[in-house]
């Protein structure tokens, strides 16, 4: 059956995601970044993902188009510096005949290639032909504890609310 996976090039580039602490950040009394510091540090790495999907002929013999928006996070560049990779949700980019565009906070847009996605984990990867963009700093989620404060930054309801910050706590 269908595994829920799609890979454009399974032998393509590999990106290592490592914890990269920033020694210049302000922390709270527990040594954790404050909400303001999280926003300042992560917001430049947040992108909008705009997709359109052209469905094949409907009952009337016409092509139909659907569109949607989501959030992505800049992972980093490939070794050549030619491409930048973006993590997003699989449900945003999955489908046939999907055209994706990545939009930066300043409005700059790039056509994006769907590298692959896994519907079961809802993780997708895009790539754009760009360099010099600020990649997000990734931590180790296995070090989180129940009750610890966490934050999410994204574009709820599309790019109109670009870089919205919300907070919560780790549950079980």
Where are these regions (language model features)?
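Serine-dependent protease modules
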Residues: 3-172
